[in-house]
Regions:
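Substrate/ligand-engaging "lid" and interaction regions
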Residues: 1-42, 46-537
């Protein structure tokens, strides 16, 4: 069995292997899409293929949509050459369920794959043709937050961005210049409206995308490459909108175990490849089942019926509330607690931590118990149901290869949102945050983690963090097994509003965190003992 249009003719074999096939005519959908594209997507990687491709597949299957998605890769052209075109743009979607079983389905909704290479005439001319089509309704993105960045920390444009600014719109290279140039093409072809939708997992994603596109356009205007009228066109949200969105679906790299099971079913040529840009990608995509996509409903040229495939269409304020619910209460704070304690207690898989009585109890306390009284309720999703699914379905999923070490990366940049917002809400509601028990325990766990010594007293490597040098320097005289070596070294960290968004002493929990920390450095097994003492009724 081969994952190609020819290979799908062997319908019985696929059926016997328990793999669902599209109910629609894939070639006809591709033909219609090429003639009259309505949806272009930039960033042809895994989350796009299984989640966004799955949405389109659902809509085509139900007759809500006649056309698929035009997929554009802006960074790693090997993806098109090695994963799209040899497999006729098909994708084998594998859903990894919490009970260890899988659901498998072929998606035929990715109608065309194009490389955003302005120096290759057939690729670039095709993109210009698509953007000139007045019926194009939306372009969407999963290029990661880095794809929108134009400047480095020094405030100067990255050299490759500066090159795009200096060059004319005819030969762009970076994603933002490519999109800006194609919007200029659309403007010149008659100024048809368009929705430009970021689906990347970062807050205020639509604003970030809009700022980058506008910056590029204004730089080109200064050089006389584009007109002020073009800048006005993309500045007018009734012409070119930049809806905000919230996306949530864990899509790990292709798993070896999944690849083996597909090969055992008789599927050929399904193994992952490593591209020249170091992308690890396969003809199949594996991901968890739960998925959320919430989009601000602002589409000036119409849109597919996305809500009929489970997408929540709403206003900008609600998108923001869902994002806030997820990152400040229902998912991210739980992840960070498991990350820091997982490293200190010797875990290498987040899912395994949920079998640990104390750590399981800790996330129950942080989310449902302490988070819920002050949670941002978006109205369209139940925070209680969301956090329940996170704790009972998503984090314990044995297929999820997430490690505490990866999630512990950049924790100093995350604790302000993940814990600081709840602490501030308690101060606003109750005058202080002294009611909190589990969140101070999570913060104490992070401080204990920063010693780089596990609960047995053995050293481990700390994950990267922009504040690591500063934080470890503050704690350099604290010695594992010597409680008396603690002489207030945490004060500079816990009172730092740049880290937590609030001085934790003013919130009434700084001293409590210090006490917990001192208990946790007492010697081997002290972290486990402290968790037990503080997480029993």
């Amino acid at each position: 069995m081969k994952l190609t249009l020819q290979g799908l003719q062997e319908k019985e074999q696929w059926k016997n292997a328990g793999i669902g096939l599209p109910s629609y005519d894939i070639e006809k959908v591709a033909e219609e899409t090429k003639k009259n594209p309505v949806w272009v997507h930039f960033g042809a990687g895994n989350i796009f293929r299984i989640f966004i491709g799955g949405i389109a597949d659902t809509l085509i299957s139900s007759g809500e949509m006649k056309k698929g998605i035009t997929c554009v890769e802006t960074f790693d052209f090997d993806v098109v050459d090695k994963i799209y075109r040899p497999y006729d743009n098909l994708v084998l979607a594998v859903t990894l369920k919490a009970d260890g079983s899988t659901d498998k389905k072929v998606l035929g909704s990715l109608a065309e794959a194009i490389k955003a290479q302005s120096e290759v005439p057939e690729e670039w001319d095709r993109l210009k043709e698509i953007f000139s089509d007045k019926n194009l309704q939306m372009i969407s993105f999963t290029i990661t937050e880095k794809g929108y960045a134009l400047k480095g920390v020094d405030g100067n444009y990255f050299p490759f961005i500066q090159k795009d600014i200096d060059n004319r719109p005819e030969k762009p290279v970076s994603a933002m210049a490519v999109v800006c140039a194609l919007l200029y093409e659309r403007f010149q072809a008659g100024k048809a409206p368009l929705a430009v939708v970021s689906m990347d997992n970062c807050s205020h994603n639509g604003e970030k995308l809009r700022n980058s596109i506008l910056t590029m356009a204004k730089e080109w205007e200064k050089k006389g490459y584009v007109t002020g009228e073009f800048v006005n066109y993309i500045s007018d949200e009734d012409q070119v909108s930049f809806p905000w969105s919230m996306i949530d679906k864990i899509t790990p790299r292709p798993a070896e175990s999944v690849c083996r099971s597909l090969e055992e079913l008789g599927i050929e040529d399904i193994a992952p490849v490593i591209t020249s840009k170091n992308t690890y990608i396969a003809p199949f995509v594996n991901a968890e089942g739960p998925q959320y996509l919430v989009i601000e409903d602002h589409f000036p040229n119409g849109r597919p019926a996305l809500e009929k495939a489970g997408v929540y269409m709403t206003d900008r304020d609600t998108v923001n509330k869902v994002e806030r619910m997820k990152v400040t209460t229902c998912l991210n704070p739980l992840h960070t607690a498991l990350a820091v304690y997982g490293c200190v207690l010797g875990y290498t898989l987040i899912a395994d931590e949920m079998k640990d009585e104390e750590l399981n109890r800790l996330v129950h306390e942080i989310g449902p118990v302490e988070g819920m009284p002050v949670v941002t309720d978006p109205g369209i999703l139940s925070p209680e149901a969301f956090v329940d699914e996170v704790i009972n379905v998503r984090i314990p999923n044995p297929f999820m290869p997430d490690t505490p070490q990866r999630i512990a990366t950049d924790t100093s940049q995350k604790v302000g949102i993940r814990y600081g917002e709840t602490i501030k809400a308690y101060v606003a509601q109750y005058g202080d945050a002294k009611k909190l028990k589990a969140i101070p325990l999570a913060i104490a766990g992070w401080c204990r983690y920063l010693l780089g010594v596990d609960d047995k007293g053995e050293k481990f490597e700390l994950s990267s963090d922009p504040m690591l040098a500063e934080l470890t320097a503050a704690l350099k005289d604290v010695k594992f097994g010597e409680k008396e070596s603690y002489t207030g070294q945490l004060k500079s960290i816990l009172s730092n509003e740049n880290i937590f968004g609030i001085d934790l002493y003013k919130a009434g929990i700084g001293e409590k965190i210090e006490e917990l920390f001192v208990k946790e450095i007492a010697g081997p097994g002290a972290v486990r003992k402290t968790l037990k003492e503080n997480l029993t009724d």
